[in-house]
């Protein structure tokens, strides 16, 4: 086995090590997720200082080590300076990095995930300054695509109970559809209510005294009643249904509250399936709460 290898990767996480080093977690096209020491990168004027920063893309020469590999050369080929200049964009980028760190594999090529992450970071960076809720829309779009790549796409076109297509009724302001995280997507509330009524009726019948106990029992398997995690209006479902498209729909600033709802649903869904909280989401909450207060 070669003692050194080349890789192209983007830095997703960095932590201090010793007096002057960093351990950098990098998503590479060729080898997936790797952790490597950036020696001396915390020293003033270190050549690896800026190259070991978050969301920097480098061509790397890495030396194999017993427990941790070591970066010996790094040539920067792409940076995203616009992300650090906007708190909302930075929080959204860190949010995406957390999801990628959960789903990326090690010692396997991850070219599709690498390309997808870079594409969405580029889109976030290119957003015009001041479009705070545009950040939420682009974040939701990116999260949906990352979930789809991992095979965790939420079902947003058909009901998880009836398997029938659900189309939002924009003419009815009271129209609603349920979203069940455990069931994996949207739920027709009429079908859901029907199941609940059936279950209540069955429960009452079981509680009634039976004069004669039959010699046999009939076992009936009822459809499980899903827990409704959220209720969406027609605009919110319409947004959710369009997130599978390669390009995001035109952002309507009158729908800011709807983007908040869509992001919250996708966040809860991602956390459930990834099995861990997205810590950067608290920054998103703080940022958009502050922006909402400033515009009220």
From Swiss-Prot:
A Pfam family recorded for this sequence: RecO_N
Matches recorded under InterPro entries: ARFGAP/RecO, DNA_rep/recomb_RecO_N, NA-bd_OB-fold, RecO, RecO_C
Identification of the protein by name: DNA repair protein RecO
Cited function: Involved in DNA repair and RecF pathway recombination.
Family affiliation: Belongs to the RecO family.
One CC-aspect GO term: bacterial nucleoid
UniProt keyword terms in alphabetical order: DNA damage, DNA recombination, DNA repair
GO biological-process terms attached to the record: DNA recombination; double-strand break repair
Top-level lineage group: Bacteria
């Amino acid at each position: 086995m070669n003692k050194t290898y080349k890789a192209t990767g983007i830095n997703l996480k960095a932590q201090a090590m010793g007096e002057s080093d960093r351990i950098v977690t990098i998503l590479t096209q060729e080898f997936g997720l790797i952790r490597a020491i950036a020696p001396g990168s915390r020293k003033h004027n270190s050549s690896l200082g800026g190259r070991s920063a978050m969301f920097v893309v480098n061509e790397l020469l890495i030396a194999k080590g017993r427990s941790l590999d070591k970066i010996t050369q790094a040539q920067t080929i792409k940076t995203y300076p616009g992300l650090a200049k906007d708190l909302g964009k930075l929080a959204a980028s860190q949010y995406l990095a957390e999801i990628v760190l959960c789903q990326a594999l090690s010692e396997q090529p991850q070219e599709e995930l690498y390309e997808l992450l870079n594409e969405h970071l580029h889109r976030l960076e290119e957003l015009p300054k001041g479009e705070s809720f545009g950040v939420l829309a682009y974040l939701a779009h990116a999260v949906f695509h990352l979930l789809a790549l991992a095979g965790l796409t939420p079902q947003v076109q058909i009901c998880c109970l009836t398997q029938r297509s659900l189309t939002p009724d924009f003419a009815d302001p009271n129209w609603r559809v349920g979203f069940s995280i455990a069931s994996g997507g949207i739920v027709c509330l009429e079908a859901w209510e029907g199941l609940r009524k059936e279950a209540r009726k069955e429960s009452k019948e079981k509680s009634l005294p039976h004069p004669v106990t039959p010699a046999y029992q009939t076992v009936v398997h009822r459809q499980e009643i899903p827990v409704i995690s959220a209720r969406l209006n027609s605009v919110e479902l319409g947004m959710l249904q369009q997130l599978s498209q390669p390009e995001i729909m035109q952002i309507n600033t009158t729908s800011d509250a709807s983007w908040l709802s869509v992001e919250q649903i996708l966040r809860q869904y991602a956390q459930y399936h990834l099995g861990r909280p997205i810590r950067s989401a608290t920054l998103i909450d703080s940022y958009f709460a502050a922006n909402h207060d400033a515009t009220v």
